[in-house]
Amino acid sequence: MPEGVAFPKEIKSFVRRAGRTTTGQAKALEDMGPQFLLPYQTSAIDFIATYADSTGARGNNDINPGPVILEIGFGMGEATAHIAALMPEKNFLCCEVHEPGVGALLKRIGEQGLRNIRIVAHDAVEVIDHMLPLQSLDGVHIFFPDPWHKKKHNKRRLIQSALIAKLAARLKVGGYIHCATDWQPYAEQILEVLSKEPLLKNTATQTHPELAGYAPKPYYRPLTKFENRGIKLGHGVWDIVFERV
């Protein structure tokens, strides 16, 4: 693992899930970490240097590194790797605090030969606050964040107005936030929070009025094993997509 990279021990909007890092994940952390893991820092990230060898880079002499998508909480990286392979022209900055998940995504990166992913194993809120300049992102993905089912824990949900305001300010005009959840009360909260952010507009309002503010599943988001299992059990999934104005 690169010097300066450490998995946070404080519980904030997340909880560290129990789970053992497998031998394969540990090997990926050791072998792939130096190239694809970024240490948390309190200064703005240099996207040009970070993605210089990425498939999303637009040439060594071009100051534009290509579109950058932030992903918050990628789990075991199944959807992340799928989307990065589907969109080689885009660069992905992915935040996750679960060490086995980070190892799993690094393993996928190696197996699939992906070059357009970088990972910060740190609390995403602090990454947003300190590493991401204003109007620097082309998109944000937040798929299946912890719903904190109990009412007394709702305040710990990731998607709150303060976070969305920070993300909206860091999106370029025309950039988007895409959230997905399989917990209807959380979907309703997400839709309400994003609707109140003045820098965002709902992409589904005019195109799909029959969905009451929710969006059809975008083509790039795959059905994961977890999601497929839920669908077979009759669980719903809600996609919410808003655009920066």
Curated annotation (Swiss-Prot):
Its EC number is 2.1.1.33. It comes from the Bacteria. Keywords: Methyltransferase, S-adenosyl-L-methionine, Transferase, tRNA processing. This is tRNA (guanine-N(7)-)-methyltransferase. The gene is trmB. Residues 152-157 are annotated as: Interaction with RNA. Catalyzes the formation of N(7)-methylguanine at position 46 (m7G46) in tRNA. It is an enzyme of class 2 (transferase). One of its GO terms (cellular component) is tRNA methyltransferase complex. It catalyses: guanosine(46) in tRNA + S-adenosyl-L-methionine = N(7)-methylguanosine(46) in tRNA + S-adenosyl-L-homocysteine. The active site is at residue 146. Disulfide bonds: none annotated. S-adenosyl-L-methionine binds at residues 71, 96, 123, 146. GO terms for molecular function: tRNA (guanine(46)-N7)-methyltransferase activity. The keyword Zinc does not apply. Coiled coil: none annotated. Substrate binds at residues 150, 182, 224-227.
